[in-house]
UniProtKB/Swiss-Prot annotation:
The keyword Aminoacyl-tRNA synthetase does not apply. Keywords: ATP-binding, Isoprene biosynthesis, Kinase, Nucleotide-binding, Transferase. This is 4-diphosphocytidyl-2-C-methyl-D-erythritol kinase. It is an enzyme of class 2 (transferase). Pfam families: GHMP_kinases_C, GHMP_kinases_N. NCBIfam families: ispE (TIGR00154), PRK14608.1 (NF011202). InterPro entries: GHMP_kinase_C_dom, GHMP_kinase_C_sf, GHMP_kinase_N_dom, IspE, Ribosomal_Su5_D2-typ_SF, Ribsml_uS5_D2-typ_fold_subgr. ATP binds at residues 103-113. GO terms for molecular function: 4-(cytidine 5'-diphospho)-2-C-methyl-D-erythritol kinase activity; ATP binding. The lineage of its organism: Bacteria, Pseudomonadati, Pseudomonadota, Betaproteobacteria, Burkholderiales. Catalyzes the phosphorylation of the position 2 hydroxy group of 4-diphosphocytidyl-2C-methyl-D-erythritol. GO terms for biological process: isopentenyl diphosphate biosynthetic process, methylerythritol 4-phosphate pathway; terpenoid biosynthetic process.
């Protein structure tokens, strides 16, 4: 077993798994293996699932809370823990509880963020001492969005999402709307109408912009809004309050930036009752960044 540190106390509670927003998302190509190449900027925000971990000595990894619609054996949290065991030979296990608030199929990275928090927390609880880059490598095998949460910073991403360059973004407030539709990512990426040839952008061009929140577009947005009417309606409603509102990821959530918390809250108070909405604040760093 790989161990380079003395063991900490056996329990780590109240571990945040923050959501992300894609400030833009350009599909730049498709590889021979079927994966799409992208360019995007990931913005971390303070809307979080919360995970709790207890170390076990018997090697068993158990999710001890129910997550509707997600069997434990396929949950990215369980898969992340087992991937860490496989990569290191760790003989410890863990009981993992999840307070799940981030919507699934929302395009905000909830499952990927839960997996990253699991890697960060168990690397600490099991006394493994793996470097952040190694945890990112393990995370990439679980999903293309996992590495940015392990990186723990806002980032410009390229490739399939694994080529990450940290970027500094201004403090911001966003209104995020979940129109209560689940959008399957695979269905959006496989649509024959999806354009896959957006020209590559240069990170310096994005970084030099005074307003970083009207850059580019989300290439998946026309597909998702054509297929899912509630996504289209939520986006149209939000555009009445900010013309640069857009979808994050492959949907279903849509978002817009506002100058301050009070303005964002005023918009949220007008939200039609059939949708869920939230006022969120940007994060410069992942709350668990110090664990790696």
């Amino acid at each position: 077993m790989h161990r380079s540190q003395p063991l900490p106390p056996p329990e780590l509670r109240d571990c945040p798994a923050p959501a992300k927003l894609n400030l833009f998302l350009h599909v730049t190509g498709r590889r021979a293996d079927g994966y799409h190449t992208l360019q995007t900027v990931f913005q971390l925000v303070d809307w979080c699932d919360t995970l709790h971990f207890r170390r076990r000595d018997d090697g068993v990894v158990a999710r001890v809370t129910d997550v509707p619609g997600v069997p434990a054996e396929t949950d990215l949290v369980v898969r992340a823990a087992r991937a860490l065991q496989a990569a290191t030979g760790a003989t410890f296990g863990a009981d993992i509880a999840i307070d799940k608030v981030l919507p699934m199929g929302g395009g905000i990275g909830g499952g990927s963020s839960d997996a990253a928090t699991t890697l960060l927390a168990l690397n600490h609880l099991w006394g493994l001492g793996l470097a952040r880059a190694e945890l990112m490598r393990i995370g990439l095998a679980l999903g293309a969005d996992v590495p940015v949460f392990v990186l723990g910073q806002n980032a410009f991403a390229q490739g399939i999402g694994e080529d990450l360059t940290p970027v500094e973004l201004p403090e911001s407030w966003f209104v995020v709307i979940h129109p209560k539709q689940h959008v399957p990512t695979a269905e959006i990426f496989s649509d024959e109408c999806l354009t896959r040839d957006t020209p590559l952008s240069i990170i310096a061009v994005f970084a030099a912009r005074t307003n970083k929140f009207d850059f580019g577009r989300n290439d998946l947005e026309p597909i998702a809004t054509a297929k899912f009417g509630e996504v289209a309606r939520a986006l149209a409603w939000l555009k009445q309050h900010n013309q640069h509102a857009r979808m994050t990821g492959s949907g279903a959530c849509v978002f817009a930036r506002f100058p301050d918390a009070a303005t964002a809250q005023q918009v949220l108070e007008r939200l039609p009752p059939e949708w869920d909405g939230r006022c969120v604040r940007s994060l410069a760093r992942h709350p668990l960044a110090a664990l790696a």
